[in-house]
Amino acid sequence: MPYLPIAPVAPVNDLQLREPLPAVVVSSPPTIDGEIGEGEWQESARREGFYDRDTGLPSDERAEFWLCYDGKNIYFAGRVYTDPKKLVAEEYRQNVSLGGNDQMRLSLDLLGQGTGGDEFGINPRGATEIELNGGRAAKTEWVGEFEAQAKRTETGWQFEARIPWQIVSPAPAGLRDARFDVEWFRSNKSNTYSYAYTRDDRTRNPQWAGVNVPKIEGNDQFLLLPYAFVGVREDEKFESQVGLDFKRQLPGGLSLVGTINPDDVNIENDILSLDFSYFERLAGETRPFFQEGQNYFRTGFEAQLFASQRTSNIDTGIKIYGDVDATTRMGALAVADFGDQVASVFSLSRRWSPQLVTSLAYVRNDQTGLYNEAGQLNSSYTLGDTTYYLLTQFTDDEQQRSGSRISSGVIMDTAKWYADLEYTEVTPNFFPRIGFAPERDFRRVGLFTRYGEQLTIPGVLEWGVGLNLSSSHRFNGAFYRDDVGASADVSLLNGLGFSLGYSAGRFEQFHDRSFSIGATYPYNDPYRLVRAEIAWSRFQDRERRDLELGLQYRVTPFTQLSLSNEFVEFDGDAETQMVLVATHDLGKFEGVSFRLVRRNYDYNWNASYRLSGRRGTEMFLIVGDPNSRTFTNRLAFKIVTPMTLGF
């Protein structure tokens, strides 16, 4: 079948870099009711016209937005002209993920340098999502909330929103030029469009010119989240725990967060898949203290000098993070397990120009017999589509002595092509004790490249192919490993997605290979989909078969099921893992959930009731232990009561 012609992707000099949007102060704030009345937004700045975020092609449907502010709030409204029958609007709550929903998002960077930004999303039912600069834990009192009202219309949908200045990442009060963008996700195209086509370069986002940022009242208070937990087990063993999380905004745009006896009673740890690996794997971090401001603590990429999962037991912790000024970001953290371990982290990055960025970090582990220090100094320089980088890391360990890791490379990133050519060397004694660096003692040259296009083949939304090559030797010259891999994926307009993968290589004395094929339908609906992947492999001279099945199903508008099943046969030995999760909303702020985990012949389940996601007291009732290998007969109750403390 012949290719359809497609307009050429704009080069860097022809990006859709919009003119500054004047920051308009309104004397009469609009009413937030979802009705964009005639003349209601006439004082505001209005714009229209959106471009495909990946290709720069203009949208074939129309949308417009309004933006203004006063001393208390930022006001944002939008109207989308589309088929209302094709809208996806599953969510109706506040501060939730809007993935897969039709939505508009306002991206706002008050410092105006492209170092970060906050995002505020609204769907056609008025549900909201907040993604604040630096990362936040799911605590309404800390994240904040904003009001939005939306409605479907005969010509599409529209919304109005009021965003308090108090929840926006802080900037010094006074007149400034901020940066912004507006993104629009269309479920009928499974595609995202933006007001400015910048190829994801925030330094090129349009200016919101002449914003007079007000002094935010109330930021000098301590926000306290004390909690209490009581529980009883089958053997009548009584459990209890109390603790406190606290936060305060500091002068100059920094935030202070602390914890005493951290609240992780009902935190469900991530579950690792059954994938094969020669090296250690690390599950994701789910504890709120470490999630808060996590993007300010950058201690590496492939190798991380600090991995919070290494500090599994902490009694207290404190961190300070934020934007020191428009070009400088910092984070400082210390956690302690009294009588055993104190871990500390410092991270600093600076954007010297739109092209040049440098960063440094220092990590220290104070522990008897296990003392460790680690540091890094990184820099990158971007010219057009090409970025040159140098990453250096050093460690000094009480047992392993001194070591280093150095990576240098060049990245080319265009609308269709991505390529990364890198040289890496890691000494045998490189050892970040409270970090994550599973490979040591090698020199490697590697290349990864990917090519992809959108809407160039009839019936195909997007397709892509990738290739990776690498060769590694030990420091003494001995062979270590060679790898080659290829992948391909395609997403059809009917919602069906396919993927293929092949890899082959030699790891020390073993000759390995793997071939996989996967399918998802529909890939553009996170609430209702099925997926399957099967792989045929040979590792360590042994045959392996993997089968993974997954299901997401929206039983009712308030009930969601999620199921994943993994089956592995490795050299005649079988292994299985199943995770079943069911959630049901009793209201905007109430819900029940159930999780069942089966690992071979071990079963664990837990059920819970929650009253959370709103301002005020939160309550949780938990049956079982979510992180036990097998079922624990336990009944527990937790209460969290927010407070404020001013001086």
What are these regions (language model features)?
Residues 85-92, 129-132, 170-172, 267-269, ...:
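A short, polar/proline- and glycine-enriched secondary-structure boundary/capping micro-motif
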